């Protein structure tokens, strides 16, 4: 574990060094500022933990990428992105550190980068699974452990990113139940009618009882996400 963590830190530091070198040679003041921020972000995460939304996005990408590199990953699913990223987003938005538009741009960049990842396959598998789909399932909306709907601004922005980028990854899913906001369901349907095949819809009122019947506690079942194609599971407890 320590070796893996050290490797992740070393990997991020290489990007910090490269961004700093690029900034020193850059004559465009706007781009130079961007590169200096990137260098600082990569020096901080994942080693020191994210302090804001921009760093959280960078940390998310490093971790997702490293998991794929380590295992030639299949179904390395980001899960409830709108839930674990929201505290960073709200903090920075409330303080004026970022705008909603900039946060949306960062998310759009993540959506693009998720399509960079590929899986090394043998010849037969490559023929049967042609293309770049790695089943990186990212899910938005739904309820928390206390049966309270937790759809938030990022839930909508996840859908917006899929509209903007219009690429197969992430495999966007949404959780729906009788507490889902009507405008969230309508917005998800707007993406559906584009014909891209996203999002997939998962009914909390069916899936939560089914997970309980398989041995999960009610609290864990309410916090489910989707792995790979369609497999519901509690985050962090897949083994």
Describe each PLM feature range.
Residues 1-24, 35:
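Mature extracytoplasmic enzyme cores
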Residues 25-29:
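Charged, low-complexity interaction regions
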Residues 1, 30, 34-37, 41-239:
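Conserved catalytic cores of very large enzyme subunits
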């Amino acid at each position: 574990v320590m070796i893996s963590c050290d490797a992740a830190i070393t990997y991020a530091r290489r990007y910090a060094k490269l961004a700093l070198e690029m900034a020193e040679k850059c004559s465009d003041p706007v781009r130079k500022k961007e590169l200096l921020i990137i260098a600082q972000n990569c020096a901080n995460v994942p080693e020191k933990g994210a302090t804001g939304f921009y760093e959280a996005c960078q940390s998310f990408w490093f971790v997702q990428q490293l998991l794929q590199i380590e295992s030639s990953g299949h179904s390395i699913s980001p899960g409830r992105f709108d839930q674990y990223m929201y505290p960073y987003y709200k903090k920075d938005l409330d303080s004026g550190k970022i705008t909603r538009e900039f946060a949306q741009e960062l998310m759009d960049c993540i959506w693009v980068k998720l399509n960079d990842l590929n899986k090394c396959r043998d010849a037969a598998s490559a023929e049967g699974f042609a293309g770049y789909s790695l089943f990186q399932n990212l899910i938005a909306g739904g309820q928390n452990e206390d049966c309270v709907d937790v759809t938030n601004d990022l839930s909508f922005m996840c859908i917006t990113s899929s509209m903007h980028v219009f690429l197969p990854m992430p495999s966007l899913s949404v959780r729906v139940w009788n507490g889902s906001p009507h405008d969230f369901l309508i917005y998800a349907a707007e993406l559906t009618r584009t014909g891209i095949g996203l999002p997939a819809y998962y009914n909390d009122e069916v899936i939560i009882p089914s997970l309980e019947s398989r041995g999960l506690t009610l609290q864990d079942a309410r916090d489910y996400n989707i792995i790979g194609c369609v497999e519901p599971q509690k985050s962090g407890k897949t083994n």
